[in-house]
Amino acid sequence: NEIFENVDPALIDRIYSSKEGIDLSEFDFKDVIHPNECFVLKSDRNSVLARYNPFTHSICRVTKGRNYGIEPRNAEQSFAFEILNDPNVKLVALTGKAGTGKTLLALAAALGKLTDYKQVLLARPVVALSNKDIGFLPGDAQEKVAPYMQPLFDNLNAVSYTHLTLPTT
């Protein structure tokens, strides 16, 4: 993540107090950021997690959201959660090391959209299981893919079901 230092502390204060954000033209780095890019703004006395919103042409504060008992634990997760929960962003690609919360945050964001959509599709990339065809493994199809799908099931179990109420049809 990009860190912009020596930002005017008054601009950072304005970002904290503004719901709409601050117009991009007020920032020196306006020519080097991309739509929906997240970054840290630092001054000598304060800092803020921020994002460039291309729809409003403004720099907005990234807030620590929460869906179904799941909330970000660090700046990177806060950035991911912000973008995942923005209805104007149609596609999000998260990359990073295993175990950093990408799938869990994506699942929590998806569950937050159940009022707008009928289902959540949870998938894993298709890869050969240790270079063996699944047909040669012992057991039925569910037993064969269970170890491969377990990380997804673990993430589902991590969601607090006390917060989960599925829409009725």
Set out the residue ranges of the language-model regions.
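Conserved P-loop
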Residues: L105-Y161
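Interdomain "pre-motor" coupling segment immediately N-terminal to P-loop NTPase/helicase cores
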Residues: I3-R61
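Hydrophobic anchor at the beta1->P-loop junction of P-loop NTPases
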Residues: L94
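Conserved small/polar residues in nucleotide/adenosyl-binding loops
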Residues: T162-T168
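P-loop (Walker A) phosphate-binding loop of NTP-binding proteins
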Residues: K97
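Conserved adenine-nucleotide phosphate-binding loops and their immediately adjacent elements
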Residues: C60-G69
